[in-house]
Amino acid sequence: MPPTVRQGIRTVGTLRVTRPSSYVLSSREFSVLNRPPPNYPGHIPLTTIERGALAVGSAIGSLLNPRRADLIAALGEATATPYFIYRLRDAMLSNPTGRRILRDRPRISSKTLSVEYLRSLPPNSVGRTYVNWLDREGVGPDSRETVRYIDDEECAYVMQRYRECHDFYHAVTGLPIVVEGEVALKTFEFANTLLPMTGLSMFAVMRLKPEERERYWELHLPWAVRSGLASKEVINVYWEEELERDVNELREKLGIEKPPDLREIRKMMRRQKKAAEAAREKYQN
């Protein structure tokens, strides 16, 4: 047998041996009565029917109540496979910083990020901007759900990383956690990551007030599409190494355009509404 043929056979054999466990799991039929063992701590293998039911149920539930973070997390996991989470993982593998993140497996939590250290950073630094945003919104870095329904262990980490970095995206864009702000940020994330859950979250526009919907269509949707497509893939940002950098410098480096301050817009609209009501009452009296 020619050497090139032997080498080709060895290569194919290696590829077969090193197929990810998720491929083996997804290609092997099972039922709720003979569920395979988990691929990582906390992993729950799902049948195709179970995954579909989880996607539909969590989509309906999160649309009815956009504040249910657990349902949004389940929707993200149920719809990320078989293609989208692998595309995001491959985007990390094709980037030097993304590869380091996959190798190091950093986690973002109150145990890994010192709030006191973040508050000691210069006012316009990434870390200070992040902790100021956490304080203003009344949230913390430990509020993210743990990934359970993605079969491949490495892809599960990619989803966990995306989830734990979400508040950094909030901080650098300045968008608050009100539904209007979340929909705007999810639209940006969809343009940047292509994760289906981020796109499906746009249906929450239907739950916005008329003036909020108008702002979304005229202001936030164009910004999100423009900035999300033009910027570098945010999954490849090693946030732990960017904490001391000037936040404006980081935005410029990533190509992220900061949207108008939504909190200030909402405050201004409330003031105008109160002034109009007071003027109307004065006129009627």
Curated annotation (Swiss-Prot):
EC annotation?
4.1.1.130
Its keywords, alphabetically, are: Lyase, Membrane, Metal-binding, Mitochondrion, Mitochondrion inner membrane, Transit peptide, Ubiquinone biosynthesis, Zinc
Q: Where is the transit peptide?
A: 1-11
Q: Which co-factors does it depend on?
A: Zn(2+)
Could you tell me the membrane topology recorded for this protein?
Answer: Peripheral membrane protein
* First-listed, main subcellular location of the protein, grouped into a coarse class: mitochondrion
Q: Where in the cell is it found?
A: Mitochondrion inner membrane
Q: Which reaction does it catalyse?
A: a 4-hydroxy-3-methoxy-5-(all-trans-polyprenyl)benzoate + H(+) = a 2-methoxy-6-(all-trans-polyprenyl)phenol + CO2
Task: Say yes or no: keyword Transmembrane present.
Answer: no
InterPro entries on file: Coq4, Coq4_euk
One Gene Ontology term of the biological-process aspect is: ubiquinone biosynthetic process
Catalytic class of the enzyme: lyase
Q: Name one cellular component (GO) term.
A: extrinsic component of mitochondrial inner membrane
Protein task? Lyase that catalyzes the C1-decarboxylation of 4-hydroxy-3-methoxy-5-(all-trans-polyprenyl)benzoic acid into 2-methoxy-6-(all-trans-polyprenyl)phenol during ubiquinone biosynthesis.
Q: Which HAMAP family match?
A: Coq4 (MF_03111)
Complex formation? Component of a multi-subunit COQ enzyme complex, composed of at least COQ3, COQ4, COQ5, COQ6, COQ7 and COQ9.
Q: Belongs to which family?
A: Belongs to the COQ4 family.
Report the protein name in the record.
Ubiquinone biosynthesis protein COQ4, mitochondrial
User: What species is this protein from?
Assistant: Paracoccidioides brasiliensis (strain Pb18)
